[in-house]
């Protein structure tokens, strides 16, 4: 494919050092492009976060692309082979922070819209974009706030494509049609500090927690299902003691996380953890944080359309998967009937020398255009 508009727009976005939540006028650039083809733009800013809701049309179905203009910090700049905010073509790849996650996806959807509208100026339904500068950070003032606004006025989405990088080995090989929930615990096991030579005068929280830890790590939380792997429990941090070799610690801090399927619930997991701790007589304080519930789009029209567009452009059959971390899809699903995630390779996201394959860029734009054509122009699946 010789289409170069997507590459040029991706470069323009990457050149803006939009480290979360600083948008650096990325959204302004998108508005300038989309205004020319009939999109109305609504700024929905909260605190330091910039959000934009763009829409062309007033009818249904509404096909929405969701993305984020913010990027994670670069890490040590000297370790990059080229400056992270100077998009560089090298060895058949485009390098730069945000190349994969997710400025290329945004660029590809914008150019797909430009071509689609040129060919179908009176298309069915509406096209929308929900863009935030707060996905890589706390994600408190970004997509979730925009969803609240849209929900309050009854503005719903029929089909949503989140441009997260999803490809594993080649473009189009994987579509995310759901995500696991994420539930974290911050556990403080209480003991009594003392001299290590006099254990009878102390209570060692490491020892009292050990049997419960064994049971927690061996527990089968659920078996998963057709779309989700079994729920996983992982310890991320354990810390206790003063650093001295002759002091029994007074407290033990344990941080853990569940990635849970639709076979489990937040309340159910909490209850089971408390039951195990209580069973072993652990004295503790436990604080919980749930950053996202599991969600799923059953195989249906949107997944079929996306697979057809991928097959047409990439010549492969896409796999449906719910693996990986959380995304803003967890917020959007509250107002979206069907939602998928589809973007470039995730092999280098958040890494030094983040990149995408140059020949994947026009293909991804063509895939997005193919989805629009099938949903809003009556093209056969």
UniProtKB/Swiss-Prot annotation:
Q: Where does Zn(2+) 2 bind?
A: 101, 136, 350
Keyword line: Amino-acid biosynthesis, Cobalt, Diaminopimelate biosynthesis, Hydrolase, Lysine biosynthesis, Metal-binding, Zinc
Q: How is the cofactor bound?
A: Binds 2 Zn(2+) or Co(2+) ions per subunit.
What catalytic activity is recorded?
N-succinyl-(2S,6S)-2,6-diaminopimelate + H2O = (2S,6S)-2,6-diaminopimelate + succinate
Q: What class of enzyme is it?
A: hydrolase
Q: What is its cofactor? A: Zn(2+); Co(2+)
Molecular-function GO terms, alphabetical: acetylornithine deacetylase activity; cobalt ion binding; succinyl-diaminopimelate desuccinylase activity; zinc ion binding
Which residues are noted in the entry as Zn(2+) 1-binding?
68, 101, 164
| Annotated catalytic residues | 70, 135 (proton acceptor)
Q: Which domain of life is it from?
A: Bacteria
* Swiss-Prot/TrEMBL GO biological process terms: diaminopimelate biosynthetic process; L-arginine biosynthetic process; lysine biosynthetic process via diaminopimelate
Gene3D superfamilies (UniProt xref): Zn peptidases
The answer to whether keyword Disulfide bond applies is no
What EC identifiers does the entry list? 3.5.1.18
Question: Which Pfam family, any one of them, does this sequence belong to?
Answer: Peptidase_M20
Pathway-wise, it operates in: Amino-acid biosynthesis; L-lysine biosynthesis via DAP pathway; LL-2,6-diaminopimelate from (S)-tetrahydrodipicolinate (succinylase route): step 3/3
Family label = Belongs to the peptidase M20A family. DapE subfamily.
Q: How does it assemble?
A: Homodimer.
Reported function: Catalyzes the hydrolysis of N-succinyl-L,L-diaminopimelic acid (SDAP), forming succinate and LL-2,6-diaminopimelate (DAP), an intermediate involved in the bacterial biosynthesis of lysine and meso-diaminopimelic acid, an essential component of bacterial cell walls.
- Stated name of the protein: Succinyl-diaminopimelate desuccinylase
């Amino acid at each position: 494919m010789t289409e170069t508009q997507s590459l040029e727009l991706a470069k323009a976005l990457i050149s803006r050092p939009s480290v979360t939540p600083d948008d650096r006028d990325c959204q302004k650039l998108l508005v300038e492009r989309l205004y020319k083809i009939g999109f109305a733009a609504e700024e929905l800013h909260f605190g330091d976060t910039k959000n934009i809701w763009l829409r062309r049309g007033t009818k249904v179905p509404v096909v929405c692309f969701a993305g984020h203009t913010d990027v994670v910090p670069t890490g040590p700049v000297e370790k990059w082979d080229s400056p992270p905010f100077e998009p560089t073509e090298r060895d058949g790849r485009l390098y730069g922070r945000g190349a994969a996650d997710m400025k290329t996806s945004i660029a590809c959807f914008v150019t797909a819209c430009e071509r689609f509208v040129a060919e179908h100026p009176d298309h069915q339904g509406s096209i929308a974009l929900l863009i935030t500068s707060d996905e890589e950070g706390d994600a408190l003032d970004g997509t979730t706030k925009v969803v609240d606004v849209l929900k309050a006025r009854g503005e719903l989405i029929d089909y949503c494509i989140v441009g997260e990088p999803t490809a594993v080995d080649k473009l189009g090989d994987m579509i995310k049609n759901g995500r696991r929930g994420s539930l974290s615990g911050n556990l403080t096991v209480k003991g009594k500090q003392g001299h290590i030579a006099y254990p009878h005068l102390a209570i060692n929280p490491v020892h009292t927690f050990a049997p419960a830890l064994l049971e927690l790590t061996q527990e089968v939380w659920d078996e998963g299902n057709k779309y989700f792997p079994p729920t996983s429990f992982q310890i991320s941090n354990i810390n206790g003691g003063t650093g001295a070799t002759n002091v029994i610690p007074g407290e033990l801090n344990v941080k853990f996380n569940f990635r849970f399927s639709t076979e489990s619930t937040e309340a159910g997991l909490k209850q089971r953890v408390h039951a195990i701790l209580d069973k072993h007589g652990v004295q503790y304080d436990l604080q919980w944080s749930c950053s996202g519930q599991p969600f799923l789009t059953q195989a249906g029209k949107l997944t079929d359309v996306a697979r057809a567009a991928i097959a047409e452009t990439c010549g492969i059959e896409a796999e449906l998967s719910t693996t990986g971390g959380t995304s803003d899809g967890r917020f959007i699903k509250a107002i979206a009937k069907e939602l998928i995630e589809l973007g470039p390779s995730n092999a280098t996201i958040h890494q030094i020398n983040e990149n995408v394959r140059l020949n994947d860029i026009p293909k991804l734009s063509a895939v997005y255009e193919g989805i629009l054509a099938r949903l809003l122009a009556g093209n056969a699946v």
